[in-house]
């Protein structure tokens, strides 16, 4: 790729961040962007190296990247990650950890650039074929996408590896080779070492043709996105859940297309045909009083009444009890659920007695008598009346004085906790993330 081509992709004052592994692709990319940045001094350029810790050479690679960046007078940060491949395999786990680390290291306005090239695109399409993917999977890697709130750009995607090698030799670049790239147990390496050389020898432009097919699949998916956007918007509720009864009376093809797009929009990727069938049979078609759930990696699909919810997996808080000895200090809740703090702006709760300890729990059972109501009711019935989904019930902070339930902030005050003669206070729950509500 020549330098002028970057002008069509980047603004002169762009803040650029290169995912720099030290391999051929990212070395060429960083070198080219260094030249572009010198022509656009108002722009900024830095590198991020992800240290996976999987190879005995990982420390040496990190040092190499830092040395190259010092020579080129570019900032370089090393991001250390832990890779757990027990669930989805080392390749997928390393990729997930890498992108999470890169995303967390980006600042507002940064553009992340990665070095995938034409041969990588060809491999991605063939792997999608091997998995039996549909058009969305066969569309492979887009030139640009969002990584959280930041753009991710692949400027070398139409360049064959051979041209990158020629560029590196011409400019006397030094790069590292990951020994794991020779391990044929990994599918991508098998394609790269065994299959693709044969295909390229028979059909020299096989990679270009594959990329064209991927682009056509991408266009078809974009068209479907446009055609289904209005109907999908009608089904998605304010909390992000999906109203599913209309899906049950439309064609399976249309229903599956809408489900796929909703799940992808929730960050769940594109589900397989088998996964969609399980959603229909085990979740949508289950009896009305059931509480079906399907796990997908680190998320799960659940149903409550007429809605589907895509939820992150959380550790149970059922047995957690937090002491709140000093009500003048805010109390941070676990798992990013926010903060509790006391306020005298309203007299909703009575003050605790000297012998009453204030605590926060996430589970209660038995009868509860709400302030201003006659008689009590079972907690389960109360949650149903308040339309609180089952998974949220143990993620709401319950305020206790000793063993007596006093209130759930923002929801209700019990008879035992109600203020008398306008002498009292209130507890305010500042939610750090709506994630805790789901």
Regions found by a protein language model. Name each.
Residues 1-197, 226:
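Core alpha/beta nucleotide-donor-binding catalytic domains of modification enzymes
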Residues 2-24, 43, 81-83, 97, ...:
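AMP-forming adenylation/ATP pyrophosphatase catalytic core
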Residues 75, 174, 205, 269-270, ...:
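Short coil/loop linkers at secondary-structure junctions
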Residues 130, 200, 263-267:
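Hydrophobic/aromatic-lined pockets within catalytic cores
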Residues 193-194, 198-210:
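Conserved anion/nucleotide-ligand pocket segment
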